[in-house]
Amino acid sequence: MNPNQKIITIGSVSLTISTICFFMQIAILITTVTLHFKQYEFNSPPNNQVMLCEPTIIERNITEIVYLTNTTVEKEICPKPAEYRNWSKPQCGITGFAPFSKDNSIRLSAGGDIWVTREPYVSCDPDKCYQFALGQGTTLNNVHSNNTVRDRTPYRTLLMNELGVPFHLGTKQVCIAWSSSSCHDGKAWLHVCITGDDKNATASFIYNGRLVDSVVSWSKEILRTQESECVCINGTCTVVMTDGSASGKADTKILFIEEGKIVHTSTLSGSAQHVEECSCYPRYPGVRCVCRDNWKGSNRPIIDINIKDHSIVSSYVCSGLVGDTPRKNDSSSSSHCLDPNNEEGGHGVKGWAFDDGNDVWMGRTINETSRLGYETFKVIEGWSNPKSKLQINRQVIVDRGDRSGYSGIFSVEGKSCINRCFYVELIRGRKEETEVLWTSNSIVVFCGTSGTYGTGSWPDGADLNLMPI
């Protein structure tokens, strides 16, 4: 083959290869464009427009990136839309309670800027648990912390942090409040926030970060609510509110709320004589609350709320071992399933209990007359028998000599059952500890367990000699 023929042959082969490559590139381009248009069902968006899933509210978004011949195709996987919680699973069977969380707020205040608080509680959305408290508009290491023993001021706000995160300066102030309750319906948070004059206070209902409704004090005597979580079932949330005397007849109402709007109000009915600071839990298809009788009884009132027909039934925890403080000692205390026991009825403290068949789990201070120590136990037949005093599975949460305070319940939905948890407020400062001028708290949290557990004590632990005065 002469040189000219070689050149012609090489050129022909090169041209053929180039032509094949050209058509391959065209085929790849056509394939890419076809896949792109097929993804959006041939509805091509304008340039730079993001195609959203339906529904357009995307709460947990996942984007999958696919690389194809240097062309990026974004494929959006639509999450399951948020649904209202119905709490229809059974209650978990437990043997006792295991440690869950402790925020150490007072100890941390010795060297950092931590809010002065009281009336803490815990509530969970479907993914996380949060701690709440009523702040005093100041940090502890601040002269404004003087005289924060006062319950109601215009500076108090509801604080919210992820559980275990102390209320630092970056904490969100959810609303203005000196009394509150919060709960998540499966789609958004509802906050009930009470503030204003003692004789003309306002309750604001904030849903998904927006003020939706409000109600004014109906008895003009310190409108107040639960100081723990409310409960939502299938989009309807219930909250117990009281207005009137703290040591006599008061006017208690149960409000039914849907996405922040009050849709119905029921008046307390049944045999409960005085109801404050209820600790409520879902008891499908309704809601059950165990409250504080600040007038006649050291046995705790019960409220059963029917979500569907808005009916209310009230009574008292039967257990012969009673849960309020002050109370008689266990050997001489008595109870009644329908009426207050008329033993050490004046004053009291927020607390909790929940039914377990005919039995009852409860928590209370160890000291019968003051807010010292904290214990939990199960009373056999305590939900059905007023003479029941058989106590099992007792646990010490805070030793007898250390301060405690309010306590309350919150519920956590698991894969197969609903667990009950509780928190204990660990109050420090005035009135009892006069070496400082402030009053604040930390918290400790336990949750029900079907496993084994040990012993211990989890007090606040701050040395007031190391604290700001």
Label each residue range with its predicted role.
Residues 200-206, 248-253, 297-303, 370-380, ...:
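Structural motif
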Residues 289-291:
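Extracellular cysteine-rich, disulfide-stabilized repeat modules
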